[in-house]
């Protein structure tokens, strides 16, 4: 027995999965053919661009500064001068033991960086303020021991 779609039904009167289905007919869109020509290659003459060279200033400077804080004991100074490719300078600072460390340096293209360190003993050590540390008391409470 066949149903309205042509599927074979079993004589038992029940329904079963169809034996096979045919795929619908597929339709394809028409293919459009395009004729593309190769792009035309054109070469242009290079454009000459005028570049203005900025003048390079001659490197020359000089600076110095100093700090003298008696409260913290921060005592230092520095000075430096540059003339062309030669840099000369020095800095000094007071060490915690009261001595003064002075560094004199020079740097140039021929000799590189060179430094000489001098140490001058201090007349008296710089007193550093002691740090006061106070701890809060720890509260301890013992739990009572209970026997059953």
From Swiss-Prot:
Residues 58-128 form the Chitin-binding type R&R domain. One of its GO terms (cellular component) is extracellular matrix. Keywords: Cuticle, Repeat. Pfam families: Chitin_bind_4. It comes from the Eukaryota. Coiled coil: none annotated. GO terms for molecular function: structural constituent of cuticle. InterPro entries: CHIT_BIND_RR_consensus, Insect_cuticle, Insect_Cuticle_Struc_Prot. Sequence repeats lie at residues 16-19, 22, 28-31, 37-40, 44-47. Component of the cuticle of migratory locust which contains more than 100 different structural proteins. The tetrapeptide (A-A-P-[AV]) repeats found throughout the protein are also present in many proteins constituting the protective envelope of other species. PANTHER family: CUTICULAR PROTEIN 76BD, ISOFORM C-RELATED (PTHR12236:SF95), STRUCTURAL CONTITUENT OF CUTICLE (PTHR12236). This is Cuticle protein 8. It comes from Locusta migratoria.
